[in-house]
Amino acid sequence: VDGDTGYGEALNVMHMVRVFEEAGAGAVQIEDQLLPKKCGHLNDKKLADAHDMAAKVAAAAKARRHLYVIARTDAAASEGIDGAVARAKLYLEAGADAIFPEALTTAEMFREFARRMPGVPLLANMTEFGRTPFFTASEFEAMGYRMVIWPVSSLRVANKAQEKLYAALARDGGTHAMVDQMQTRVELYKTIGLADYEALDASIVATIAPEGMPQRERSA
């Protein structure tokens, strides 16, 4: 789960961790930007004090029961690899399980960061139209990264499909030209697991409310 900047200070971070755990999350990432934050691939990002961020990481580590805590740093753009590595080490000391160096711009930067963080689980962000070149999962693995996210890819594909749909609707007055690009009703129901919900619904016993006032009848 993307925990943004933790939604506040240490106590807010602790609350966030418990809420995410109760919702079933297995991991959360927290970043070191200041509000109002920006996409990691934009310019003029403002960073939190490294020790303030470390305090948030420590709060997350203290509050969690099992949640995996990933500390993200956006420092490479303004403080270089040296700054990003220094922050990452501080966050690890505070209790982070893994490090996410955001918006590295070359394979050399990815390799150098990994070289200077031996044995540390690292996460890479592969977002299209950003500052990071295209790399595959296996290429990231070869550079020393155990985890990769594609956080906006499905949204971009879905938005493009919606643009095409509404353009066709405006042009044709109907959706007939787009039917072959849609899920069928059967495919949709399979995707959302409708049969499982129907079975669950059928298995629930109807509630039977007591009639009258049985306590009063027994006392009589």
Task: Identify the residue ranges that each predicted region occupies.
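Alpha/beta enzyme core
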Residues: 1-150, 156-167, 197, 204-218
